[in-house]
Amino acid sequence: MNARNGRPAGINKLRAHTAALAVCAALCAPRAAVALDAAACTALQSFERPGSALEITAATTVPAGPAPAGPPGRAYSGPLPAHCRVDGILERRTGVDGVEYGIRFALALPDDWNGRFLFQGGGGLNGSVNPPLGAQAAGDTPALARGFAVVSNDTGHRGAGGFDASFFADQEATLNFLWLANGKVTVIAKALIDAYYRKPAERSYFVGCSTGGREAMIMSQRYPTYFDGLVAGAPAMRTGFSNLGMRSVSVAMSAAAERDASGNPIPGSALSDSDRKLIVDSILKTCDAKDGIADGLVFDPVGCGFDPATLTCAGQKNATCLSPTQVGAIQRAMAGPKTPSGRQVYAGYLYDTGITNTAPGTLPGLLNGAASPVGPRTPPATQDVEAEAAAVLQTPNVLGDTATWTNLSTFAGHGGKLLFYHGVSDPWFSALDTVGYYERLAEANGGMTATQSWSRLFLVPGMGHCAGGPALDRFDLLSAVVDWVERDRAPDSVVATGTAFPGVSRPLCPHPRTAHFEGRGNPKDAASFECR
């Protein structure tokens, strides 16, 4: 599929790590350098597109140098190439609430362009324009450093922090956030690329996680001819229900929590540090070696089979067991929210090594009992799941949800490729919810084998929300999707590394396959594993 115009519309042995690096080197190299002077960049200040309420607010040359600071979890401090940065606003207006709205965007046009365009997805409720780098799921080298033209935007509103929902008061701002803004920005970005380089982008890609993952799915569903390759990480599907799920975990864990002077549960007190270690050690004892080697990673979380009831104290509570109250709380938390009649309203969660994570800079592990980032600071002690589920259906997020649409015949028919990835220990959006969508997608599109000819899902053991945790959380899905689109090489595995396990690499395998140690070779090397 060649998306230029912007109109809607078995067992495999892992390649050696060095081969994977060679692929990246080939994909990262510029195809045809385009040398442009400062005047060509400045000239974009007068760019107009008929029928678009567009203002170019700046067009400046940026010399090669270090990257600017980016959002947590996607930091990149390496060098960036010389490029032209274009800043603009689409559809500036005053909303019904008296607030000024407009779709602000930033487009980086590298001097040595490789002919590719990448749309950088957002996060949270957006509301700011992040530096257009394309670092998400790109391993050690972001898209801009590879020669991609990269765009980012605020989806039509400015927010005070990542979860400022005040823009929902304005209908157009809401619709722009949910899906319209990214479609509009794609059209403008492609037009600017065409004007600057005097030729259109040869291939177009979209990469995002969380809200950006939902946005990637939106592109496959509502703009199926805009992009050739999409990478959707931990997609923020059914956001109201995922928040309900986080609250249900907090409520479940509050039953075992200590109380403050007012009788309220103290967040994070249901489990001691020794309890958390006991849980993770027990999960590893039950599930770690199922992949052929005990290495501190659970590569078959779906088939793990851990039961916390095995840790129930026979007598007094001590460091080698959990109280019946704690066990019950964990079981209810991991099962996911249900109504009194037993109806499951959001997916449950998988037993994994990151569910008790306490590392700073990331969301607390699922069982730490913390409140949702968008909920009350003090977790509730009770919950009316039925009422909350009904209330979710009245929120604007439902309009932009991506959990039910599985007819991607146009996207797939044009040769589009769609990669999903999700941290198994994600406390906010259950990995099982993404697995559920992917399996429904396969069912609606001719079965798993047929669907895997254009879409694949990779689960990341130990990883939290988009990054972090006791995980190998650095991997290059950007090269994987480019290689699939442009060379028809499907990603039978993706090599992952991470600071939590220095000197270790492992293959991430397309669901439902999992990584297994072959029993020979270096156990720290991904090349010693196969997906089966």
Question: What do these predicted ranges mean?
Answer:
Residues 208-218:
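Glycine-rich nucleophile elbow surrounding the catalytic serine of serine-hydrolase chemistry
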Residues 420-422:
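Short beta-strand/loop motif that positions the catalytic acidic residue
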Residues 428-432:
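Conserved alpha/beta-hydrolase "acid-adjacent" motif
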Residues 218-220, 225-338, 459:
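A catalytic-pocket lid/entrance helix-loop region that shapes and gates access to the active site
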Residues 199-210:
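Alpha/beta-hydrolase fold nucleophile elbow
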